[in-house]
Amino acid sequence: DGVINKDVSYLYKISDLEWVDGAKEALAYAYSKGYDLIVVTNQSGVARGYYKESDVQILHDHMAHELDCSGAPILHFYYCPHHKEGSVQLYAVDCECRKPKPGMINQAIKDYDVDPKSSFLIGDSQRDVDAAEAAGVKGYLFTGTNLLDFIKTII
């Protein structure tokens, strides 16, 4: 939330999805330059009982389809459903995957044999950048309004 889709509190409904300006184009641009596209996202709404993991998966499937149609195939969506103060006991844990910890990024590196030194992560909060750097990946903080303009300063 906040990088490829607009940050609406606890997004899980497809009807609430709004793409950040230039997001689809930015991802297609990165893909055209040889980058694999992987998403890592905290989804504490699951731990808080606002929605279920299946809702996250449905939304991610929809996003993946739209992005694929835009020339930006997502290799994998990693998400963390945990929050140590969650109300759903199963997910109310202090895990290794919730950013700013690097667990999801490390898992992606392992699963897809990613070279951290030739990779980068764009996030909308310092915890995203911290997670990237803890995994040996360059992190960039996106605070603008157009992701394509931003990514062209990186690639």
Whereabouts are the PLM-identified features?
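Active-site neighborhood of HAD-like aspartate-dependent phosphohydrolases
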Residues: 1-38
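Short glycine-enriched, charge-decorated loop/helix-capping segments at active-site entrances
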Residues: 9-18, 51-54, 91-95
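Substrate-recognition element of Asp-dependent hydrolases with the DxDx(T/V) motif
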Residues: 23, 27-63, 72-83, 132
